[in-house]
Amino acid sequence: MIVNGLGLGSFMRRSGSGNSNRASASASASASASTLLPTSSKMDYVKLQPRIGSTFPPPHRTQLPPRFHSSLTSGGLPPGAGRSACHRNWWILIPALLLLFFFFLFFTLSGQFSAKISPVQNYKYGIVIDAGSSGSRLHVFRYTAEGKMPSVDTAGGDKLSLKSKPGLSSFATSPEKAGKSLLKLLDFARQKVPEEERAKTKLYLMATAGLRRLDLKIQDAILDSCREMLQRSGFLFRNEWASVITGTDEGLFAWVAANYALGTLGGDPDETAGIVELGGASVQVTFVPRLLPPEEFLIKLELGGVTYKVYTYSFLNLGQEAAWEALLQLLFTRVVRTSLPSASDGVVVDPCTPPGYVMSEEEIHRRSTKFGTTSELEISSVLSAGNFSECRSAALKLLQMGREACTYERCAIGSTFIPELRGRFFATENFFYTSEFFGLPATTSLADVEAAGRHYCAESWSKLQEIHKGIGQEDLLKYCFSTAYIVALLHDSLGVAMHGKRMHFTNRIDNVPLDWPLGAITVKLAQENHQRPALSRLRDSFITIFSFLVLGAITTQCSFRLKAIMSSGEVPLTS
């Protein structure tokens, strides 16, 4: 502090010289008094008090013994004490602030560079059970959580996943047995996760369309059975982590998985790819559109510091198996008729099954009962026609059902809004399995899919069985319908060009499986990482505030000490 060009030390030095002069005068006065008064008549200084209304001023401090000096001065500090005390405080403050600075610097840099400087990755683990309609698949993920985006180790691939059958939905009549179906999967997980990490490894069970189609009470009963088993697994599990996820979640997770594999997350949203999944029970369409869709179709997702505005929708009962079953029902109930001739009204013409296949009477009766066929529409036989064009037309009618209720500008499937597709897309699951069966490359066109389907549908059933001896009957039956359904869905409904290369039929990107569980664990970890910077900011704010409080406290203390010294008369206010 500088006053009138003089530093704090100048004031303290001037105060010290004044005090010494006054002290000498006081000593002389005391000596004179002691020679004039006898000991018995000396003034009792203890009882000396100023009288109220007295015209005499109170005694000067030099008239009092030293023990009274502290009671009549503010702080009673000796000359130079304020300066030395403040100096001592500053010598304490400077190392403290330096220590706080290095503490802040260490934690900031360690969070950014620890993964780079450490030769050994300290992996953490997470587990996701995909409880699908045909079976349950367990995925073990290894990851590190440094940076804005988690780093999931995808090198393990299939070695870190295992599938078991049947699916949880098959326990609808005996839900209490569902939990035991997970034993094999949990044993597999224990082999992959180190023992010391198991209690810290989060375990999620996410059921999809297979369980979504069941009654809510049955869903809860099946999940409760699974929860009991998962609680005893040795992994970190909470009851709410076993749930039936929505089709929207499933589509979003698949989109995250695809773009994580591409390395586009955390960058420009327009550079991301879209994804269309053809599952067994449902279809998911997810991508970042050019224009914002209606609010009910929009999801805002923050990943890597970037907010993505994603369109996603799940079409329940339009997955490959569910759609085929639904189409047969439409044929059996005459809701959909083909232009192909039939021998009689009791004969159903099936354009999606290769010619020569004969449906047994038991199968016809089962389907007639299931579909609620009336006696007037009693089915005597099913004629397998194997006609690609008619099958495609029937599939399109199925996809367009309910379009008359559309209230949006554009309804591509039923009465549901779908924006115009943009950018590249990945067609996964049954899209890929069908293209793989026909030996088509990932960049195949829909025209190639159509050509393969036409040839397959027209081939006799006996010839197909002879050519594909290693494939089961149920699988062979579906490929005529599958090719026609793919063209009806992607071209006739979503507007994908027949000869374009926009669609990539694959389940992998750079050997990374495009499984939605990868997206699910990525989103979960990103949410946890999003909370960590908030805690880091809170820590940094605490350090800053604490530093200012220490500085303020010492400065205030020095200020009060200086004022006390000045008010006591030790420091002259004028030179």
Segments (PLM) and residue ranges:
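Helix-loop boundary elements of multi-pass alpha-helical membrane proteins
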Residues: 69-95, 123, 563-574
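Beta-propeller domains
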Residues: 147-156
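Membrane-lumen (extracellular) interface motif
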Residues: 107-121, 266-268, 563-564
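N-terminal Lys/Arg-rich, disordered targeting/topogenic segments
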Residues: 26, 48-86
